[in-house]
């Protein structure tokens, strides 16, 4: 009896393997994912790590989807992509248990399904800026946390899986906090969505990785070689954004290309048929500032004045460590994914002339300075000395560790986020306005509390000296 049963099982497995090798029928799992082997069914139904991942999807991803359905529009669309990415990672986790560890080239092909999903989310943040841009960026940037599955060892260039999830969320949290601040008194559905997104990763994904894969995915040494999943009929290719698992940073945004395009338009106008029939206006044809009138500007003087450019040219983008002591981040335009990951407490960071960019500093540094920047966000961990903001407009700074001093000088518009470990930070301001400080709420789940620093003061001469107090305005 037992021998007959074994033979029937072997025959069934052989038929399933034949179907799989021919690209035929795919076995559908009731709890998600498609796999072309009977082993996939057993793993998905009994393996504790897969069951725990399914619970993560049903609980945490489900909560985010429920909140997104109340909002609708692009927020729901990008949340569905997040759900798709988690489902794709679950499928990869099942396949890893049946697959030998591949080389780097094979790993890229193996992880391509997950990478394709993250590229769809990235595409939603491009083009015309949406009213829900902060939602889209928070969701898109959060997906980089799923790259923990690409960890292959300490020398692979990635942080350990648990640390990678935490570090990846830091960049997403920058935009997630904006959602919380913007909608905290406007729409509870958006606040619920932002909280659900954070809890999906912290503690959700972090605790899952900590419990099941603290050292990365465990491949099957006796399994089959890794290969990319079978593809369907090819569709029309779309221009892809930067991949999730790329070792290089993404290319600059199209803002510089737009500027070059406008310059080309003006150059074409000045050299085309439109202006070919125009005649040069000589001095004797002028009715203003003619050379024969007193007080006229001489041609030599005029040429000297006009030869100087009205604005200084922007230098080339720069992001480098100089002399081993100073990180120089200069002239970065439209770069949302700048990261300094290797730094120490003896180094300083100087950010100059940047616009519409976000920089993340991972680790402790001596001091950080932002100079002449517009619409720049900086997320940092710890500084030993001070964080300085000088000659800036509309900057946002988030401290995730500690900072003894934050100095704001000659700046209009600064949003400063302090965490529970940096509430004793000393903040000094001079010749600045619109300085708002966000601090955590009284409870772990509480909303951020905004405090506007005073920019008007009342000076009264009393008992031989001036006493200065901030001016407070009470609403009617």
Curated annotation (Swiss-Prot):
Residues 246-256 have a biased composition (Low complexity). Belongs to the CAP family. The gene is CAP1. The keyword Transcription does not apply. Residues 224-262, 277-319 are annotated as: Disordered. Actin monomer binding protein that accelerates the exchange of ADP for ATP. Regulates the pool of unpolymerized ATP-actin. Key intermediate between actin-depolymerizing factor (ADF)-mediated disassembly and the profilin-based nucleation and elongation machinery. InterPro entries: Adenylate_cyclase-assoc_CAP, Adenylate_cyclase-assoc_CAP_C, Adenylate_cyclase-assoc_CAP_N, C-CAP_CF_C-like, CAP/MinC_C, CAP_C_sf, CAP_CS_N, CAP_N. Residues 316-453 form the C-CAP/cofactor C-like domain. It holds the Pfam family CAP_N-CM. Residues 280-293 have a biased composition (Basic and acidic residues). GO terms for molecular function: actin binding. This is Cyclase-associated protein 1. Disulfide bonds: none annotated. It comes from Arabidopsis thaliana (Mouse-ear cress). Residues 231-243 have a biased composition (Pro residues).
């Amino acid at each position: 009896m037992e021998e007959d049963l074994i033979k029937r099982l072997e025959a069934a497995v052989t038929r399933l393997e034949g179907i799989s090798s021919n690209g035929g029928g795919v076995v559908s799992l009731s709890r998600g994912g498609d796999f072309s082997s009977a082993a996939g069914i057993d793993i998905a139904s009994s393996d504790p790590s897969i069951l725990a991942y399914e619970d993560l999807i049903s609980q945490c991803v489900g909560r985010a989807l429920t909140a997104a359905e109340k909002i609708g529009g692009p927020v729901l669309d990008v949340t569905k992509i997040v759900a798709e990415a988690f489902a794709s990672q679950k499928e990869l986790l099942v396949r890893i248990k049946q697959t030998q560890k591949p080389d780097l080239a094979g790993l890229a092909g193996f992880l391509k399904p997950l990478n394709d999903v993250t590229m769809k989310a990235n595409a939603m943040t491009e083009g015309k800026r949406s009213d829900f841009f902060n939602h889209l960026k928070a969701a898109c940037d959060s997906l980089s946390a799923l790259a923990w599955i690409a960890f292959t060892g300490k020398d692979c260039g990635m942080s350990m899986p648990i640390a990678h999830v935490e570090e990846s969320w830091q960049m997403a949290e920058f935009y997630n906090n904006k959602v919380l601040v913007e909608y905290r008194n406007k729409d509870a559905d958006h606040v619920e969505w932002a909280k659900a997104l954070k809890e999906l990763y912290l503690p959700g994904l972090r605790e899952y990785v900590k419990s099941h894969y603290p050292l990365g995915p465990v491949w099957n040494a006796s399994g089959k070689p890794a290969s990319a999943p079978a593809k369907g009929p090819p569709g029309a290719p779309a221009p892809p954004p930067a991949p999730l698992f790329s070792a290089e940073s993404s290319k600059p945004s199209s803002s510089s290309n737009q500027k070059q395009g406008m310059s080309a338009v003006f150059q074409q106008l000045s050299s085309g048929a439109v202006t070919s029939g125009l005649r040069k206006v000589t001095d004797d044809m002028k009715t203003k500032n003619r050379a024969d009138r007193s007080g006229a500007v001489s041609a030599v003087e005029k040429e000297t004045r006009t030869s100087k450019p009205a604005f200084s040219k922007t230098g080339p983008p720069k992001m480098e460590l100089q002399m081993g002591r100073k990180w120089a981040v200069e002239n970065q335009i439209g770069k949302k994914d700048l990261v300094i990951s290797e730094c120490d407490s003896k180094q300083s960071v100087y950010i100059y002339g940047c616009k519409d960019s976000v920089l993340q500093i991972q680790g402790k540094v001596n001091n950080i300075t932002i100079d002449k920047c517009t619409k720049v966000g900086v997320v940092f961990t710890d500084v030993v000395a001070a964080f300085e903001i000088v000659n800036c407009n509309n900057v946002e700074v988030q401290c995730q560790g500690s900072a003894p001093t934050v100095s704001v000088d000659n700046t209009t518009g600064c949003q400063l986020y302090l965490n529970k470990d940096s509430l004793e930070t000393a903040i000094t301001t001079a010749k600045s306005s619109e300085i708002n400080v966000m601090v955590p709420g009284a409870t772990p789940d509480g909303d951020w509390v905004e405090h506007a620093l005073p920019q008007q003061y009342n000076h009264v001469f009393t008992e031989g000296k001036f006493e200065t107090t901030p001016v407070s305005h009470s609403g009617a």
